[in-house]
Amino acid sequence: MDARTIIESLTGKFPEAISEAGIESPIRIRAYVDKDKAKEVCEYLKGSLQFDHLCSVSGVDYPQRDELEAVYHIASYDHPVVLMLKARLPRDSPEIESVVSVYWNANWYERETYELYGIFFKNHPELKPLVLPDDMLGEWPLRKDYEGFPNRTARNLV
């Protein structure tokens, strides 16, 4: 299955949920997904299109647009294609359904994204800090408005 066929399948199955789908290169495709359909789209990708490997989950902060993005890189062992699936989230309440039940390895990726960007993954089995100390929870150090040193928390760490 080539990139064009994958995009056609996604947009055909989820016409209201998939937008801005395109081919970056013969082996790289991208698409935006409605945040409320992201888990369902991931289930379809894995179950019907053989996108069986979640490579990463991360975040991107766009303060000028007042939003964050949850970014998923999903690959297929059957097709030489990697899909970058993005979901736009409001910056003041960035929530999206966890995909741990679809891709087990999303567990730590989502935890890291939560503690660094503040993206809340609903129904995550154990959404707690992964690498940062407990007193930094709520600081969201990878957001662009994070003040860094010498803010209150960073000063206490040194």
Swiss-Prot record:
Q: Output the Pfam families linked to this UniProt entry.
A: Complex1_30kDa (PF00329)
> Which reaction equations make up its catalytic activity?
methanophenazine + reduced coenzyme F420-(gamma-L-Glu)(n) = dihydromethanophenazine + oxidized coenzyme F420-(gamma-L-Glu)(n) + H(+)
Signal peptide limits: none
Q: Is Transport a UniProt keyword of this protein?
A: yes
Q: How does activity depend on pH?
A: Optimum pH is 8.5.
Q: Chief location of this protein?
A: membrane
E.C. code: 1.5.98.3
- Name the enzyme group at the top EC level: oxidoreductase
Cite a single GO MF annotation.
Methanosarcina-phenazine hydrogenase activity
Which key words tag this protein in UniProt?
Answer: Cell membrane, Electron transport, Membrane, Methanogenesis, Methanol utilization, Oxidoreductase, Transport
Query: How is the protein disposed in the membrane?
Result: Peripheral membrane protein
The cellular location(s) given in this protein's UniProt record come to: Cell membrane
Instruction: Report any one BP term from Gene Ontology.
Output: methanol metabolic process
Role according to the record:
Component of the F(420)H(2) dehydrogenase (FPO complex) which is part of the energy-conserving F(420)H(2):heterodisulfide oxidoreductase system. The membrane-bound electron transfer system of the complex plays an important role in the metabolism of methylotrophic methanogens when the organisms grow on methanol or methylamines. Catalyzes the oxidation of methanophenazine to dihydromethanophenazine. It shuttles electrons from F(420)H(2), via FAD and iron-sulfur (Fe-S) centers, to methanophenazine (an electron carrier in the membrane).
Q: How does it assemble?
A: The FPO complex is composed of at least 13 different subunits.
Name of protein: F(420)H(2) dehydrogenase subunit C
The gene from which this protein is expressed is fpoC
